[in-house]
């Protein structure tokens, strides 16, 4: 695991993209900047924010504040995903699957930033369709939120956790 100066529980912030956008008015163009950021605690919490302002630092600050306000909790399993998941948002489709220890994060830059701040260390991920960063971020977070823990699946199916995880055949049942 990489050495960082961050304390456990402290939020990690990553800037994904900064764009210059313009609005055409009667006197010409008015330029402003947008920023897309993700924030996470490397332990299953992640949020993203999109900010817009006249100056870059203000846009980044706004997006960081929005990201901190919009955090969600993701259930992880040994530094990877519980199971393979798919996520969709408008024209972007993503697929992620768990990987064995030592694989690392094999994903595009936008997805990699999210997976790093959420605390996933081993995953295989692929984006299809539109690679617009905003859509990829939303699709990735949708996919992570759709992931279910074995406890949730067992409860939904009315079975024991050992049956869901495949330990059923190895344990004697009388």
Curated annotation (Swiss-Prot):
Instruction: Name the encoding gene, please.
Output: rpsE
Parts of the chain that traverse the membrane: none
What GO terms fall under cellular component here? small ribosomal subunit
| One GO term (biological process) | translation
Name the keywords, alphabetized.
Ribonucleoprotein, Ribosomal protein, RNA-binding, rRNA-binding
- Family stated for the protein in its record: Belongs to the universal ribosomal protein uS5 family.
Output the InterPro entries linked to this UniProt entry: Ribosomal_Su5_D2-typ_SF, Ribosomal_uS5, Ribosomal_uS5_bac-type, Ribosomal_uS5_C, Ribosomal_uS5_N, Ribosomal_uS5_N_CS, Ribsml_uS5_D2-typ_fold_subgr
One term of GO molecular function: rRNA binding
Tell me the function of this protein.
Answer: With S4 and S12 plays an important role in translational accuracy. Located at the back of the 30S subunit body where it stabilizes the conformation of the head with respect to the body.
Name of the protein: Small ribosomal subunit protein uS5
The answer to whether keyword Amino-acid biosynthesis applies is: no
Which Pfam families does its entry note? Ribosomal_S5, Ribosomal_S5_C
Where's the S5 DRBM domain? Answer: 11-74
How the protein assembles, per its UniProt entry? Part of the 30S ribosomal subunit. Contacts proteins S4 and S8.
Species this protein is from? Blochmanniella pennsylvanica (strain BPEN)
Domain note? The N-terminal domain interacts with the head of the 30S subunit; the C-terminal domain interacts with the body and contacts protein S4. The interaction surface between S4 and S5 is involved in control of translational fidelity.
């Amino acid at each position: 695991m990489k050495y960082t100066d961050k304390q456990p529980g402290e939020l990690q912030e990553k800037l994904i993209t900064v764009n210059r956008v313009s609005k055409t008015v009667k006197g010409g163009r008015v330029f402003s900047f947008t920023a897309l950021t993700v924030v996470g605690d490397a332990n299953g919490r992640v949020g993203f924010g999109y900010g817009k302002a006249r100056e870059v630092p203000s846009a980044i600050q706004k997006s960081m504040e929005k990201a901190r306000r919009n955090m969600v909790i993701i259930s992880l399993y040994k530094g990877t995903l519980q199971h393979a998941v798919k996520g969709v948002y408008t024209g972007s489709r993503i697929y992620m699957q768990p990987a064995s220890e030592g694989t690392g994060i094999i994903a595009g830059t936008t997805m990699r930033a999210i997976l790093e701040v959420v605390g996933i260390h081993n995953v295989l991920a692929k984006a299809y369709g539109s690679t617009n960063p905003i859509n990829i971020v939303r699709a990735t977070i949708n996919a992570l939120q759709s992931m279910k823990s074995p406890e949730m699946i067992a409860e939904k199916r009315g079975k024991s956790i050992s049956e869901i995880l495949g330990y059923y055949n190895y344990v004697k049942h009388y």
